């Protein structure tokens, strides 16, 4: 039900509200109060003797608490009667820019395809973080959840780089959102808000019934902040599209996920396409990113690389512009030689930095999704072994950085490592290419022999250019069905 009310602030007059028996209505009532320069929205929630006034002007920001309004508020308390009961007035300062931004972003969100991580996120937990490289679909995934679950509460989606936060605090927004009945707050690109981890901690401690989900592309900043939230936040890393997801998104070919054990047993298959290899070739070139189907994919991917280095890494590590350019050069060198067997001294000389800084720069690039570092198992703990090889993170990046000069053998290894490390601990092999659990993997083309795995228990030959598994020979594309 909508009721229009004219409010003359000059005369501080209000009418039409007191004659409504709001308590007899089960639906929300929206009372819109129009003036030439302002729009006022008044909402009664239908369950309590409480009238909520949203003060919004046409610029989309808030009018100040002027003398007129301060005089108007007591008058509202005095004159708004429902069934001889005085309505409590509660002023909620929620900026319409944020609601309009959310509605516009939701309108643009595709809903036909969900990423692998969607079903694994405990969306109703109090504080959840989703991390991953730029452009892999984190924002789309959380907006899809909003679109599919609006019956579960009241949602607000914001991006931390919105101009609203230039002079508003995140914690204040959460306070007002909860007062207005908000239940789920989604904060995109949270690392772009300074002091985000402290304020999320405050929100967590103060609003135990508010569900907060945040995303971040700058994994470096997220990891630093997550240390402060270690006992509060559940943080989930997200990868780019698997080959299975690529087939679903771009070719409408559905396939289940297969565990590594099922793949090694030769059970991996895709129904709906007779010959998967042409699709696999396409995926290697431009299938890892959800924006692969857009015009100008290569240019956008180059922009992802530039922004990752110049913004995420440089700002996190407080690097000069000249040092950021050296990191770009380092990435180009790795791309031309990948899998790169690291020589810190040679790499330092090549790009003109101290040898002591090279491992740190490599770690920055690894954590922002530009490279992968394959380690041995000498560290005893995951991720602490000696770095044996450095890979570009995924084949799409290899082609974007190296073009036609890319080596297909390197592409194959990069694909295997990229797809397997999403759900498995992958370490280097002294005899072959990779070790996962009790299995040793040798990667190659159709003519790849068994020499490297002779006498090795659990040895697996992974071949490109074949469609079917036989014995311990598994098609390379099968490993793209793991998530």
Question: What function would you assign to each model-found segment?
Answer:
Residues 81-119:
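N-terminal pre-Walker A segment at the start of P-loop NTPase domains
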Residues 94, 217, 223-327, 331:
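Interdomain motor-coupling "hinge/lid" segment immediately C-terminal to the ATP-binding subdomain
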Residues 130:
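Hydrophobic anchor at the beta1->P-loop junction of P-loop NTPases
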Residues 138:
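Conserved lysine of the Walker
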Residues 141:
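Hydrophobic positions on the alpha1 helix immediately C-terminal to the Walker A/P-loop
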Residues 153-181:
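Short glycine-rich substrate-engagement loop in P-loop NTPases that contacts/grips substrate
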Residues 293-430:
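Accessory nucleic acid-recognition modules appended to NTPase machines
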Residues 416, 420, 434-449:
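Conserved catalytic cores of phosphodiester-cleaving nucleases, focusing on short active-site segments
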